[in-house]
Regions:
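ATP-dependent adenylation/nucleotidyltransferase module used to activate substrates
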Residues: 2-256, 263
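ATP/NTP-dependent adenylation/nucleotidyl-transfer catalytic domains that generate, transfer
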Residues: 2-14, 42-44, 254-269, 274-397
Length: 397
């Protein structure tokens, strides 16, 4: 049979995304088992990369529905306390951050102090970081970021996607004012996309290599972003030259994952919690005093409720990540992630807002300065009356 071309693959994938929940659930089960079987044949181990709600549900789905005995691995210390609690209840392996040259571990504050704040998006942050660190080697790329004009390597394009969105050019393009003859602003803080690498990506990848293990991921193409096209091109299971991974939920939408969450949470509340408690005691991971969470849904998400039209939603956070991550913050309605952090952990909020970094004069500063600069409200007393943070989708690019 002739291999499907890229467009045919994407069209076939999109068609599967339109199928009902029951089809997607069964499809995920089939693909998950196929991945395990193929890995077994190749002599590979496998694990679940666990973070927030989607991957927590994937872990339970693989164990309790697919019958696949697979460990969960996470950089848990980056997650919200309520997520960490669920991780502990499930026996998720916590992988520490990378070590620095001085032997200490990288922390959120150390990464941001040295490299910069993760703000807007990974793509935009990486471009701003290049502007803040000019060299002869990245001269052509910096020109493209400001003007959209690419050289021979980029096909001599005009108005290419390399150019920053005008909103971000205005705020971050000032590093090239003299070179490009423009009049943009520049902040007095650094911007970077390196946090994920130092705090969770590289260390979890290293764990995988050390254990000859490849990951199951809780990714969905419906979330969009850079991974969406890759998922639609390569499907749920991918065995490449340098990358091997499974994303059983790749064809799921938000409603599908919330339906499955309610289903898995029902299992948890009807005997599964006790099963994991006994296993944790037996393995010495928890003590008898450890209070198992009543729900698989971490408290940061609230509960899953249904609108009059039947649409499911979480009453608190819709998405989560590292508590100090600012990617996408400008797209969120208030109360946004930092507002919710103020409610759940005011001490951490205060540290992140005002004390996590020091300027050249030794004065403390934090996310409050960054959010002010990009026009996102953060003062808890202004919730409901401050909509500065709301932008359109183009601002995310």
């Amino acid at each position: 049979m002739e291999r499907l071309g890229t467009y045919e693959k994407i069209a076939s994938f999109i068609q599967k995304e339109k199928q009902p929940y029951e089809f997607k659930r069964k499809y995920a089960q089939i693909r998950a088992k196929e991945f395990a079987t193929e890995c077994d044949g190749r002599g590979l181990n496998y694990h679940v990369s666990v973070g927030g709600l989607d991957s927590i549900i994937l872990y339970i789905f693989l164990h309790e529905v697919c019958g696949i005995d697979v460990p969960g691995v996470s950089a848990s210390t980056l997650e919200d306390k309520s997520i960490q609690r669920v991780h502990k209840a499930l026996g998720i392996i916590n992988v520490p951050p990378l070590k620095r040259d001085d032997g200490t571990y990288w922390t959120k504050a150390k990464v941001i102090q040295e490299f910069g704040f993760p703000v807007i998006s990974k793509e935009v942050a990486a471009k701003v970081e290049l502007l803040q660190n000019p060299s002869e080697k990245n001269k052509t790329v910096r020109h493209a970021i400001i003007t959209g004009e690419t050289g021979e390597y980029g096909g001599w394009q005009k108005n290419s996607k390399m150019q920053l969105n005008q909103r971000w050019l205005k705020l971050f393009g000032g590093y090239e004012n003299e070179t490009e003859g423009c009049d943009f602003q520049k902040p007095d803080f650094l911007v970077s996309a390196k946090c994920c690498y130092y705090l969770k990506e590289k260390n979890c990848d290293d764990w995988g290599k050390e254990h000859n293990s490849v990951p199951y991921l809780g990714l969905m193409a419906s979330e969009g972003g850079r991974r969406a096209k890759s998922l639609r091109m390569n499907g749920c299971n991918y065995f490449g030259a340098s990358t091997i991974r499974s994303a059983p939920f790749a064809i799921f939408g938000r409603q599908d994952i919330l339906k499955l969450t309610l289903e898995m949470d029902g299992l948890w509340k009807n005997g599964l919690k006790e099963k994991y408690y006994e296993a944790g005691l037996k393995e010495g991971r928890i003590t008898e005093k450890f209070k198992m969470p009543d729900s698989l849904i971490p408290e940061i998400y609230g509960t899953i409720e249904k609108k009059p039209d039947g649409t499911l939603y979480t009453t608190k956070a819709q998405r989560t990540g590292c508590s100090m991550c600012g990617f996408g913050i400008h797209m969120e309605k208030r109360p946004h992630r930092f507002d919710l952090l103020h409610e759940s952990n005011p001490k951490e909020w205060n540290y992140l807002m005002f004390h996590m970094c020091k300027d050249k004069d030794g004065n403390d500063y934090g996310w409050a300065k960054v959010l002010d600069y990009i026009g996102v409200g953060w003062d808890p007393s202004t919730i409901g009356g401050n909509c500065k943070g709301q932008m359109n989708l183009e601002d995310f690019m």
